Each structure stands twice: as structure tokens, then as C-alpha cells.
Amino acid sequence: MTLLLAAVGATVTALLELTVGPYLRIGTAQPHLVLVVGIVVTVAVGLEAGLIWAFVGGLVLDVLAQRPLGSTAFALLLCMGFTAVLGRLFIRLRPVVPILATLLLSLFYSMTLFVAFNALRTPIVVADPVSILLPGVVYDTALAALIGPLAISIHDRRAESERVDW
């Protein structure tokens, strides 16, 4: 995957998250498509593509949703970096890494956005933000369980295998 393709994919996914995402809402849970697909891209393709995905997707989300510029990109960049570390730690379990990373990082992503929005805008008064965000974590993890292993196995199957050339 070229870096340009990662940037275009992040832009399209950000547009889908802002336009179709509210219609995919289940109760209070709304999917974070840029985060979930970015985690899958980072595990399947590599850190460079994941960082491009996070930066471009975050900026598109910030501009179109009129958020503080750079807040979403910052949260996504942190998540993609941690995903790359998890991908290296569990190299033998690559199809499972997106599920684990999404389970761990979805709440971190949402809380980072919550803290950034409260620091950069008028504070949002919420007694327990974690209980509000947990359904979204479950939803994102379910999406990663559907998308992640399939995308990684397709990517690995299409990758060139190293052979001894006599």
C-alpha cells in the first residue's frame, strides 16, 4: 500500500465516519471508523501507512466536524504508535492484534479527545465519562473483530513470500 493510498483511504473513511457513522449508531455507541481501520492498516501494512492514516484522517475529521485542529490527529497518532508496538510484541498473533489493540485503545482515544476538547473548548460537565464511552469501545472492538483478521490474512496472502533463489 502506498502512502498516497493510505491518505486517500483515511479521507474516505473520515467522510464515511461523519456521514454514515451517525446512522450506524446502536444506542449511545457510534463507531470510530478512522480509528478501527487505522489500527488494521497499521498492523497489516506497517507504521508508516498507519501514521499517514492517523494524521490525514484526524485532520479531515477535525476540519469537517469543526473540532479543535489537530486534536483528533494527535489522539490517532498516539493510538497508531501504540498499535505498532503491540504488533511487534505479538508478531505471531497478527490476526488477533487489531482486536486487542482496539479493545485497549478505543477508550484511550475517546478519553484523549474528551480531555483535549475540555482543554481547548468550554468544558463538558460529565460525572462519569467512562460509562458513557464503554458502549463505543464494545462497538469498535466488534468492528475490529469483523474487519481485522480478514484484512490481515488477505494482505499476508497477497504479499510476496521470501524464497531461496538458486
Task: Report each predicted region and the residues it spans.
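Terminal, non-globular segments
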Residues: M1-W166
